[in-house]
Amino acid sequence: MVDHLANTEINSQRIAAVESCFGASGQPLALPGRVLLGEGVLTKECRKKAKPRIFFLFNDILVYGSIVLSKRKYRSQHIIPLEEVTLEPLPETLQAKNRWMIKTAKKSFVVSAASTTERQEWISHIEECVRRQLLATGRQPTTEHAAPWIPDKATDICMRCTQTRFSALTRRHHCRKCGFVVCAECSRERFLLPRLSPKPLRVCSLCYRELAAQKLREEAREGIGGSPPQLSHLGGTVCGASSGDDDDSDEDREGNGDGDWPTQVEFYASGVSWSAFHS
């Protein structure tokens, strides 16, 4: 069915409509063989609070963005190749239902659907597309994934020292390796995580020690001679960095954020969270 629809006029029109909604800020989405399979609104758990996001499932990519005007205008487009995606269903709680994690090497995050049925539809459609894409490309499933960021609201104290209490003056930071919410003192180090960024990123003290030790072991195995590795901030001092010189926000940070979780009505005001174009 997907192959049959790949170069049809209706498929081209649907993809063009999505491109139009993102406008000049979005990337071109039309490619030979690409099929738009469905769309819907999911709730993405962001750093400050959970927010509705529009998602589009293609046969080879997953696209999502912020909703400015439903079915008219979107922004902050993100494109995820499906061969990099792994899904992880999450357990139900009284406060959080119909959730699962979308994991990739560069970014992992939690989303939820309006109902159990819609959650299962999303998961089954994505997993089938991932399976087909891996088969087509001959690639193996990704085994290393970025840690999802713990939401700010999850804790009022540093998750490493458990002493520092966050406030308007004492800001939260996130370790890029484990995703924990930590204070400035417990996240003074930077470490190069090539899968995430070409620049050294903020990591917590525990992850830094583990990463530095791993790097030393790897260099020892490779038999690298000469002087020891230049880990200039091994003692805990960040080279040219302070608690506020790097961007601790993700792409979903808007305004100053009050940390309150939207109600379920706000989550799903745009309607059902899965709409298949091609069944």
From Swiss-Prot:
Gene3D superfamilies named in the record: Pleckstrin-homology domain (PH domain)/Phosphotyrosine-binding domain (PTB), Zinc/RING finger domain, C3HC4 (zinc finger)
Record CDD domains: FYVE_PKHF1, PH_Phafin2-like
Any one GO cellular component localisation term in the record: endosome
Region annotation (Disordered) ranges: 220-263
All residue ranges annotated as the PH domain in the record: 35-131
SMART domains referenced in this protein's UniProt entry, alphabetically: FYVE, PH
Ranges of biased composition (kind: Acidic residues): 244-253
Residue ranges covered by zinc fingers (FYVE-type): 152-212
UniProt tissue specificity: Widely expressed.
Binding site for Zn(2+) 1: C158, C161, C183, C186
Subcellular location: Nucleus; Cytoplasm, Perinuclear region; Lysosome
Chain positions recorded as Zn(2+) 2 binding sites: C175, C178, C204, C207
Recorded superkingdom: Eukaryota
GO terms of biological process kind: apoptotic process; endosome organization; positive regulation of autophagy; protein localization to plasma membrane
Classification via Pfam families: FYVE, PH
Keywords recorded for this protein, A-Z: Apoptosis, Cytoplasm, Lysosome, Metal-binding, Nucleus, Zinc, Zinc-finger
Matches recorded under InterPro entries: PH-like_dom_sf (IPR011993), PH_domain (IPR001849), PH_domain-containing_F (IPR051765), PH_Phafin (IPR037871), PKHF1_FYVE (IPR042762), Znf_FYVE (IPR000306), Znf_FYVE-rel (IPR017455), Znf_FYVE_PHD (IPR011011)
Role summary: May induce apoptosis through the lysosomal-mitochondrial pathway. Translocates to the lysosome initiating the permeabilization of lysosomal membrane (LMP) and resulting in the release of CTSD and CTSL to the cytoplasm. Triggers the caspase-independent apoptosis by altering mitochondrial membrane permeabilization (MMP) resulting in the release of PDCD8.
Entry text on domains: PH and FYVE-type zinc finger domains are required for lysosomal location.
UniProt cross-references to PANTHER family, sorted A to Z: PLECKSTRIN HOMOLOGY DOMAIN-CONTAINING FAMILY F MEMBER 1, PLECKSTRIN HOMOLOGY DOMAIN-CONTAINING FAMILY F MEMBER 2-RELATED
Record protein name field: Pleckstrin homology domain-containing family F member 1
UniProt source species: Mus musculus
